Curated annotation (Swiss-Prot):
The keyword Glycosyltransferase does not apply. This is Large ribosomal subunit protein uL14. Keywords: Ribonucleoprotein, Ribosomal protein, RNA-binding, rRNA-binding. The keyword Ion transport does not apply.
Amino acid sequence: MIQMQTNLDVADNSGARRVMCIKVLGGSKRRYATIGDIIVVSIKEAIPRGKVKKGDVMKAVVVRVRKDIRRADGSVIRFDRNAAVLINNQSEPVGTRIFGPVPRELRAKNHMKIISLAPEVL
């Protein structure tokens, strides 16, 4: 569960390393985001010569959360770190590569571009 002020890793090669959630999109009183949800983030740490720089405000898709995710078959999936992928206003990833596994739940939220770039889908 991601809320305001949550720090996340960036799972792509956009140049950002760490971001902080500053808003969860989807309703005026929406408090938490989970896998596949879109959040507004501020870039807190970035590498030199990247596509983004520290202080930029962008949208991101949450791809990994530490909170347990229950599936319809009763299984549970959980990741070690919270992570997100930066997207532009057309909901396309800013980076050209995705690092680490992503869950199948992204398919239901129509983030097919992220799934196709990911090295592993759980």
